Amino acid sequence: PPEFREEMAGIADALAKTGSQLDLHDVLLWNTMYDSWCFFAHPNSSNQAQTFERQKYPIGCSSFSAWGEATRDGTFIFGKNMDNLNLPGILEGRMLVVCDPDNGLGHVNVSHPGMIAIDGGINENGIEMMTQYSPSIYETMRGCGIAVLSRLILQNASRVDDALNILTVYPRCTGINYHVGDAKAQRAIVIETNAKQIAFRRPYKQDILWTTNHYNCYPGWMGYQGENLVEGQKLAFCLKDVKSIESWQESLKDKSNPYLSATGRFRQYEKLLSELYGEITMESGIEILSDRHNPDTGELRDWETAPKARNDGNTIAFWAAPTTFAEKVKFYKSNLETSIVAHTGNLWSMIATPLNGDFRIAMSDFPAQRGPYVHFNLFEELNR
């Protein structure tokens, strides 16, 4: 969209005035960072029948929403964990952004310097949206990136259907689960997408909804009826069998599969939300986002104890052992040479009641849930 390009041009102009070597092309490229990372970590989809060795990628993100009968006072509550790598500059570059655009809705999101958005937030009309990485064989870089789509929704959506329309009309790049909620209407859906397909699932029988990093749009599963997105994820995750719901669920539990994204977190969210049903508050929501119990054994792990494997023992608030991604990297403008070694963990965690604008954000520690959740109010920040 031209208004976003204009905003990026303003960022580039400001950088130039500081003497930076970075220009508009760099800012544009930086705003595709998330999509480039997702795309790099995906298999080649040109031959869907081929066998391949996938690039291992970090596990990323999860969220839940609860309202009505699920919460203590009926208030719509939304929680999100942003999980990714602590690459150079990422931790010190975490930034809470309050945006009051000339045209559109005021909103808040967590981003990084130079980015117009990255992963969703809440807006002044009571809409929340967050993204969860969910790989598919249907990938492209010829479309709108996650940052652009997130910003479009936050700035323009007043209903869940508005978000669904935006994701339908604009071309998409990588596989993403968009968790969208409307606090006024007390409605939430998870829109599961890739470059080719889009489907959405509703809450199943109760006033709770959650998502992690795999598709759940499988006909007959949790009341869903529609296109099967799991078929396009089979090769991406090297799932053994997705011919039936039972075989698909067993494949997701495969602890020896090195490509799965800690699928036990989905089951753990269901367990915790069900146990707290009717009594969910912002405080108990923080406990859910900070949960470190093994989904299979119930064992509590220490903050910096890594799981046995990617799909064995990873928790909602997780921590992975450090990985060397490159022995030597030369940055193309600064000529800085360094190795890249990083943990996967929680970069930030948010709990919100979008209707009244209250939210609490943890982003000072790593993993972030170990630090304080600091209170803000969107309407106060916007001077409404």
Annotate the PLM regions.
Residues 125-127, 137-141, 152, 244-246, ...:
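Short amphipathic alpha-helical segments, especially helix-boundary/capping motifs
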Residues 112, 121, 127, 152-164:
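Cysteine-dependent hydrolase recognition
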Residues 1-60, 154-384:
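C-terminus-biased signal that marks the final domain/tail of proteins
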Residues 1-147, 170-177, 384:
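A contiguous strand-loop segment
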Residues 146-150, 266:
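Residue-level signal for cytosolic alpha-helical hairpin/rod architecture
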